[in-house]
Amino acid sequence: MRPPTVAAANLANAYNINSLMEAFGGESLLVEQKVARTLGKWVGWDQAMGIACNGGKITLMYAIRSALSRLLPDSQCQGLTGETVVFSSEGGHYCVEHIASQLGLGSDNCWRVPSNNAGQMCPKALLLLMERAHAQGKKIAAIICAGGTTINFNCEDTRVIHEVVEGFVSREALSYRPYLHLDSVIGWVYFTLLQGGLKRLPATQLPGNAVAQRLEAICERFSGLAHFDSFGVDFHKTGLCPYNNSYFVSQDRRFMDELGDGKYRFSERDFEPGQLRAYRYTFENSRGASGILSSWVALKKFGKQGLGAYIFRLQQGRETLVAAIKRQALFTQLNEKTLGHEVVFLIPFASDLSSRCVTNDELAKAFMQHCWQLTNTGVQFPLFSIVPNYRINNDPADVTTAFLLTPCHTELTNDDWDWVLRQIAEQKVVFETRYRQRQISQVSEHFERPIK
């Protein structure tokens, strides 16, 4: 977060704006569309419009509901009928099944597409699933693609996905095309580097720059976005804004009809001054304006180039952290191939503890609980997290329980990261001693799978 965005959110709350309709929402709805249009133009969508909402899960819900309405227009009035499925990347967010259930599609009708060893949706697997669905008489409403996840920055090659889909549609002479949505609530900030933005960052032009190489790879994976229908944005993740502040951004305004009740169609009159009514297409009627104003201030204050420089510095922070891990040789980085700025690492516990028939998984969870208890009592201690069932190099046969550190501050130095790692290492020794003395028991509670 930055003070200007926090101040903007507080100001909107102080004015107590409800962005339900333009007649009494002031210009909040206009600002909302200015934000969506700005974001859309970063990927070449000159007619982009969108919806400010509360969290990435809602952006996915808007996308899937739009897809269902586009495929099955009568479903807006008559409900869902027939055999319909949505696809989602295996490495994508876990909430898609829940959304399918909430929208009446059914969680069993969310099919996960296996990933390759790069963490991307496998094109061959996608084609096989499309063929299977078609053979079973099912229609594919939407394909939800990962646009950068919290762990491993799983990110599809959008150009390849589009080519696979278009080829299948043409070959089978389908009367429809599956809706393509990019779940880019983390990765959206890299859109600032498209259309020549990367070359405008002087630091990326240094030969052999590892950060620049990752950024180039990310930009290449986003090269097919012109053919997608929508994407998601979380300003509270990588946009320097307070919680919660998300956007569903569509390539055009068709979503306004697709998210309606099926009985109203938008016309040019709806966009005349004072006429826009957001309640016709939003899930909520009570819509605060704090996220809208905060995101607009972020765009005006930092701009496209400023946000691009910010994500570049976060990537540099990752390099500094990785160097500290190698320098201290206390832990082992596991995600060397990630394109993101997060660091997943392994903590080796004392061998005598493992010889007691205690698995690394049990020790890791008990250690994480030990560290959380420290922070809960007010001790100044680094905030890091645990990653159960982590696939090393995206290999389903090589799974462990790992830990996660994500640089969020752009000014941390070598000394800062050395302190962070020393603190974790010192508590590891304390934990092992207490575990031997049976002052710490095994963790019996269930740890959720990684938040993606």
Located regions from the model:
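N-terminal entrance/gating region of PLP-dependent enzymes' catalytic architecture
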Residues: M1-Q47, Q373-D415, W419-I424, Q442-I451
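Active-site-adjacent bridging/hinge elements
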Residues: R2-A14, E32-G44, Q102-L103, H134, ...
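Glycine- and acidic
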Residues: Y15-A23, W45-I51, L80-T84, D108-S115, ...
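Short loop-beta-helix segment that forms the pyridoxal 5′-phosphate
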Residues: R37-S66, W111-P114
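Conserved PLP-enzyme active-site core in the AAT-like
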Residues: R65-R254
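Active-site C-terminal subdomain of aminotransferase-like
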Residues: T149, A203-K337
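A glycine-rich phosphate-binding loop feature that marks nucleotide/adenosyl-phosphate handling sites
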Residues: L182-I186, R313-G317, L330, L334-V344, ...
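Conserved PLP-binding catalytic core of the aspartate aminotransferase-like
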Residues: T332-G378, V399
